Amino acid sequence: MSKMGTVPQAYYDFIMQFAPYLYVIPPDVPDPTYGKGVMSGAFAINFLSQAYSANQYASKQTEIRSKIIELADWILTQQCTDPDKNAYGGFKSGETSTYYYSVDAGRCIPALLDAYQVTGNTAYLEAAKLAGGIFLKTMQDEQAFGGFARAVTIEDAWLLQLDVECLYCLIGLKKLSDVDGENAGLYQSIADKAVGFLRSGFENLWLYFEPADAQWHRVGLSENEVYDDSFSFALLGLFTYEGWSDTCKAVYGSLQGIKAPAEYPAYNPAICWSGYIDVKNRYPACTYYDDITSGILWRIRAAHDKPSLAFSMQIIQKYQGAFMNWGPTYTDYSPIIPAKAMANVSWLSQLFLNYTEPQTNFTRILAFNGENLTLYPLLDVGDRTVYADGLTVKAIVAMGTAGELVFEAGYTVQDYITVYSFVPLRMHDKLRRSGVDYEVQTVQPFALNGDVEYFKSVCRRLLNG
C-alpha cells in the first residue's frame, strides 16, 4: 500500500497564524518591511483548499474554512474595482503598493476559485472572472506582442515588459474556462495568444521581452542568468495548459540537467533548483536553493521525474525546519536570511500533502531485492573531503566485472561495485555498504518512455575510507 505524505504541524500552524504575511522573522514576528501580499494569501488558499478535504485535517475543516474566507476576503480588498482605471480587476501586490502585476492576477484567480469551491461565495467567482476576463485582457491588449504587460499602477503608468513567468496565468484561465462556460472562448483566446508569443522566449530560457528594444532578456551582467522560481511557475502553467509537451520537456530537462560545478559541489538539482541559474554556462549562480521550486514542481516530478520527487521529499522531510526559511544553502541548509517565507511553506505543504511514494517496476524490484546503503552526499573538496550526514537509500548491488571497469593504479576488481538505485546519485558522493566506503565514479540514468526510471553507478572503494 502506498505511503502518503503528512504535512508537518509546524507548516500548518505557520500558515494558519501568519498568512497573508510574506515573511516572518525571529522570533515569529511578521516582517513589517514586506507586510501582507496577495501572493502569500493566494498560495496559502491553494494549500488550505486541498487540506480542507484531506484525511489529515478531517477534524480541522471549520477552522480551515474560516481561514480561507479570511484570506479570500482580504484579497478582494486588494482588487481594483474602479472601471475607469487600467488596473480594473487586478490586485495590488502588497498593502502599500500601487502596482498591479499580471502574474499576481494569475496567482489570485486559482485561489479565489478554490475559495469559491469551498465556500460557495459567488463574490470570489466574480472577482476571478473580473481578473481574467477584464484585467488580463487589458494587460494583453496594451502591447502588440501577445503576452501580458508586467504591471500597471493605479495612476495608469505601465511596465510593458512581457515576463515568461506569466505563463502561470494559464492555470487560472483554464480554471475559469471550466467554471464560466459562457466566457470560455474569451479565456481560451487570451491563453492561446499568450502562449503563442511567450513560448519561444521560454524555450530559449529568456526571462522577459522588452518592447522598447524588441529583444528578449535575462538578468546578470552578461544576461546569462534566470530566476528559478519564474521558470518553475511558468513550467507548471504550461504543463497545466498543454501537458508534457516538447516545450515542457526541453525546459525542465535543461534546468534539471545543470549539475554541481567545482565551486558548489554540494548543489543537487534533484532537491530543488538554485535561486539564480546561469543558463549559458550551465551553472548555479548563487550559494542557495530556492526551496519553493520543490513544491511548485511536485506535479511535474510526480508524473515525469519520480526519482527527484522522492529524493527531494527525503531531504525536505529530514530538514523540514530549515526549509521553512527562504534560501537554504547547499551545504547545510542554513538560511541566507533568517526569515520564514509564506510562499515557500505553502508550496512545500502541497508537496507534503500530496506526496505518494513512487511505485514503478524498479521500485517494486528494489522492495524485494534491494539492500540498505548509507549515502553521504558530497559537500566540499579542499584540504579534506567533506560529506553531509548519512541518508539511508535502497539499492541493488553487484560486484564490478573486469569487462566494464577501467582500473586505476592500486585497485583491483574487488574494489568496485555497481549500484542500481532509484536515488539520483552524483559523482563523488560516498556510499557505505557493510562498513566499507565507496566513492561514486560514474552515473548513468536509464529511462522508460523518456522518463528516468533508475540509475546505474560504478563505485570504487575508498582506500582511506
PLM segments and residue spans:
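Short, conserved turn/kink motifs that form compact alpha/beta structural patches or helix kinks used as
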Residues: 380-465
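Active-site-proximal polar cores
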Residues: 358-386
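Beta-strand-connecting loop/turn residues
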Residues: 146, 371, 435-436
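Glycan-recognition and catalytic cores of secretory/periplasmic carbohydrate-active enzymes
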Residues: 1-357
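Solvent-exposed, flexible loop/coil residues
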Residues: 95, 152, 372, 379, ...
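Short, surface-exposed loop and linker segments with low hydrophobicity and enrichment for Pro/Ser/Thr
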Residues: 338-342, 363-369, 408-414, 449-452
